[in-house]
Amino acid sequence: ILTAVATGKEVNYEEIPTQGITKITSMDSSYAAHMGAAIKLFGTSVNKDGKIYLEVAPVLVDAKYPLYAVTDVFNGILVVGNMLGASMFYGSGAGKLPTASAVVGDMISAVRFGDEPEKIGWSSEKLEVHPAAELSRKYFARFEGSERAKKEAVAAAFGDVKFVTLEGKDEFAVLTGEMTGEEFDAAAAKVGGLRQKIAARL
């Protein structure tokens, strides 16, 4: 809905790449805590060079990221503009009072506009959706095996990365530099043993 309002075009939600949190494990949370970070479910909408990139997926963020502290029944929206810079909107997204407020707002709009509903700013023109994985971004990735055994393979495939290990585990993790999803998949295949990948904003 927000993308439709921002672009003035109709967005088919079925075209948006969507990944929930069912594949996020306790091990992922342990790594995040070790790094002073958290895993959040983000809806991402990016306008770059006239193309709109969309995605719903978990993202790893650290405490410096504005949406890091959004928890429980609260929702946050981070808007970044070329002139505005970063602006954040924060508030309750569930509960009887926020829900009642939204319902009353709809009732007031219905009374005010009657048979001519309030125009919310988008046409019937279809928006061409591009997967956000086509954008360059960092990735957090877990691999089976030891850092020592695979360090050279990781360096050859990914270049400069940050290694993260948890004591007593038969695996290790890395934080990559910026790359597209396709570039990540190709590099991970060279290393082998990928257990998890999560986009990161650190």
Range-by-range predicted roles:
Residues 1-69, 74-76:
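Substrate-binding/catalytic subdomain of NAD(P)-dependent oxidoreductase enzymes
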Residues 7-11, 17-23, 103, 164, ...:
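Short, exposed beta-strand "edge-strand" segments with a Pro/Gly-rich flavor and a Y/T-containing core
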Residues 11-14, 35-40, 49-57, 75, ...:
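Generic structural motif recognizing short loop/turn segments at the entrances and edges of beta-strands
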Residues 21-22, 52, 95, 164-168, ...:
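Conserved N-terminal alpha-helical segment that immediately precedes and caps sugar-phosphate-binding
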Residues 21-25, 96, 100, 147:
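Generic structural signal for well-ordered, non-membrane alpha-helical segments
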Residues 29-39, 86-94, 98, 158-168:
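Short secondary-structure transition/capping segments
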Residues 53-144:
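Catalytic, metal-anchored helix/loop core of enzyme active sites in primary metabolism
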Residues 107-202:
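A conserved regulatory-domain signal marking ACT and ACT-like small-molecule sensing domains
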